[in-house]
């Protein structure tokens, strides 16, 4: 059986090409080729609660080895809650170099306008746009200020 290759913009559409886009953090182009946003669906786990201490509580998701995670960095995301609601989010994918020396990759998301407890519940995080690479900050205050800028960028994304 012969399968016709699909070309788009002179590029053969393939899972390998789309994986390369996700691994590079090019979420908008990956979504364009996939026909939907790349997402992770995982159960919320307890973290160190560092975000809570700086006024930016996050939900924490583990990334199994076999799951394709985007390039380390900060993303505008849309998060689908167990009750059917959606929230805009700012998501960090990476090793959290400001607060950890571990090489373990985690996914942490601040949910704009959300208050509540989601521990033990499954969320779907859809990646919309990469804002920046993951950075190490000298202080938690510098980290907090940068996350506040990222929150403003996420708000602007969803207002457009």
Which ranges hold each PLM region?
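Short, small-residue-biased leader/transition segments that mark boundaries at the very start
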Residues: 1-2
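Anionic-ligand-binding alpha/beta catalytic cores of soluble enzymes and soluble regulatory domains
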Residues: 6, 11-59
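Phosphate/ribose-recognition catalytic cores of enzymes acting on nucleotide-derived substrates
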Residues: 47-160
